[in-house]
């Protein structure tokens, strides 16, 4: 499967990139943390492919600079707008992560971990912890 990231940084460029990626991709990843201007509903409507909405934190390689609550609110808006998938980090505070892991949800949840420095020795333990959470997909990047 091929997933092509859409990074903006503005709406017009994102829409152009969606149109260019559509014939090549199985999925599109809308990297909201890299966009300064976007209309999420319009981006989702522009794609015929399933979309993964990501709002990555700086600590895991992204650019979102607002509060953790604001970041999570944007992902909740993505669910309300009809995103097929949302990608949320395991490092998200548990009280903010919990609503994404409840059984009744409109979008599938990708629970992710990113470490671009090294592969931690406790990667097996991390994987076990992630498996215990009711996410649809687990993603570990190291």
Indicate residue ranges for each PLM-predicted region:
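Short beta->alpha connector loops
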Residues: 8-12, 33-36, 90-94
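Catalytic alpha/beta core domains of metabolic enzymes, predominantly
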Residues: 85, 91-142
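Generic alpha-helical secondary structure signal
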Residues: 12-16, 38-41, 69, 73, ...
């Amino acid at each position: 499967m091929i997933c092509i990231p859409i990074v903006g940084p503005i709406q017009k460029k994102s829409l152009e990139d969606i149109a260019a990626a559509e014939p090549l991709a199985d999925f599109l990843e809308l990297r909201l943390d890299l966009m300064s201007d976007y209309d999420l509903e319009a981006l989702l409507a522009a794609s015929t492919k399933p979309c993964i909405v990501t709002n990555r934190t700086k600590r895991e390689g992204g650019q979102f600079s607002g509060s953790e609550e604001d970041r999570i609110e944007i992902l909740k808006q993505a669910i309300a707008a009809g995103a097929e998938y949302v990608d949320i980090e395991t490092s998200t505070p548990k009280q903010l992560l919990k609503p994404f892991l409840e059984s009744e949800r409109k979008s599938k949840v990708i629970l992710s971990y990113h470490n671009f420095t090294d592969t931690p020795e406790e990667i097996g333990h991390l994987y076990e912890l992630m498996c215990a959470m009711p996410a649809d997909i687990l993603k570990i990047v190291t």
